[in-house]
From Swiss-Prot:
Residues 98-124 are annotated as: Disordered. GO terms for molecular function: small ribosomal subunit rRNA binding; structural constituent of ribosome. Belongs to the bacterial ribosomal protein bS6 family. CDD domains: bS6. GO terms for cellular component: cytosolic small ribosomal subunit. This is Small ribosomal subunit protein bS6. Binds together with bS18 to 16S ribosomal RNA. It comes from Tolumonas auensis (strain DSM 9187 / NBRC 110442 / TA 4).
Amino acid sequence: MRHYEIVFMVHPDQSEQVPGMIERYTGAIKAAGGTIHRLEDWGRRQLAYPIDKLHKAHYVLMNVEAEQSVIDELENNFRFNDAVIRNMIMRTKHAVTEASPMLKAREERPRREDVREEAEEAAE
């Protein structure tokens, strides 16, 4: 089996469907004997350029190990799902399991609530 990195972008109005989509796609991979090494839901992010007059999209990253037939089926599902506005499937040399730089940056960034609480404590 080969290793793949899959990124797909979902229409921002369809963000509530993302958990179901992830479950459906991961289920198809696991049912065919594949494994999922990394799954990250990056949430809504600003696009670098407008796509179909959209400026934001919901991003999902997966690193999987699967047969080519599973990847073909997944690509076919992306193509016929109107909620998926873009997708990219790249073959990689080995399994990637560590957190992506995007997720690391998000975890390192202080949350708004934490910053607000610290500001209130400093004001007292």
